[in-house]
């Protein structure tokens, strides 16, 4: 089983990593090519391209200038410890043991606009480049064109080492990021967990809660060493429960009703 997550825009480089082990990203040459193009942009260009504030644009202008193809613990941090958004609050890698993180290294992947595909312990230099950014490059009009089928092929390399029910990809990424994967070319079926909360008289996806729940699901897989997708149905963290009637073979729906 491989579970894929989206990255986070929020990053934490202040908290020291609680594990010393790390690995290097697989697509450093590709990231270097993107950085080369990003360095041609002014802070105002970055603000316009990414629809971000001027201070944030200046921060990322400097990040691109500082970025190095050489990754060390001095200029980078393990990806799953550096990302700090809703998904990663749910995953809470800081409280996972080194043994848990070693398991995550084999079963969790993070999709990235700059780095393509990351393992949890791959070193990450700070950046901002969302997958949906229409950043024209030598390979096409946007990052989907840039990455082509590279991410899918990298996932297949991992999936092909699994067999039976364990050869499955669990999609806990956003629509924006999972568009960088080509399901028809994958060497495994895809299961997408969907998390809904009761609000206004019906169940609906509430972005903040759904993002956190994706991280909780990834943690559930890691802590319980899950390889068979049927075991995902037992997920019941923070009040969610599997709804068989609303689910099918490719979409697992989890619902939560608090209050009302």
Swiss-Prot record:
For this UniProt entry, which segments traverse the membrane? none
Q: What are its GO biological-process terms?
A: response to hydroperoxide
Query: Per the record, what is one GO cellular component?
Result: cytosol
Q: Which Pfam families match?
A: H2O2_YaaD
User: Which InterPro entries does this one have?
Assistant: YaaA
Assigned protein family: Belongs to the UPF0246 family.
Q: What is this protein called?
A: UPF0246 protein BceJ2315_22780
């Amino acid at each position: 089983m491989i579970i894929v997550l989206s990255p986070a825009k929020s990053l934490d480089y202040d908290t020291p990593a609680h594990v010393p082990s790390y690995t290097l990203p697989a697509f450093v040459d590709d990231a270097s090519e993107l950085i080369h193009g990003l360095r041609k942009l002014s802070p105002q260009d970055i603000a316009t391209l990414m629809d971000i504030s001027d201070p944030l644009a200046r921060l990322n202008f400097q990040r691109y200038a500082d970025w190095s193809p050489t990754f060390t613990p001095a200029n980078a941090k393990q990806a799953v410890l550096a990302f700090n958004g809703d998904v990663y609050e749910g995953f809470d890698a800081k409280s996972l043991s080194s043994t848990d993180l070693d398991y995550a290294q084999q079963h969790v992947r993070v999709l990235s606009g700059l780095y393509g595909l990351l393992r949890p312990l791959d070193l990450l230099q700070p950046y901002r480049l969302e997958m949906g950014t229409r950043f024209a490059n030598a390979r096409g009009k946007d990052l989907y064109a840039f990455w082509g089928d590279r991410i899918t092929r990298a996932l297949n390399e991992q999936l092909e080492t699994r067999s039976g029910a364990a050869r499955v990809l669990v999609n806990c990424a956003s629509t924006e990021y999972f568009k960088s994967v080509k399901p028809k070319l994958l060497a495994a079926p895809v299961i997408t967990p969907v998390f809904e909360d009761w609000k206004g008289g019906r169940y609906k996806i509430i972005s903040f809660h759904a993002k956190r729940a994706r991280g909780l699901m990834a943690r559930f897989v890691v802590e319980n060493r899950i390889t068979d997708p049927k075991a995902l149905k037992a997920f019941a963290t923070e009040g969610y429960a599997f709804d068989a009637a609303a689910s099918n073979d490719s979409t697992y729906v989890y619902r939560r009703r608090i209050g009302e």
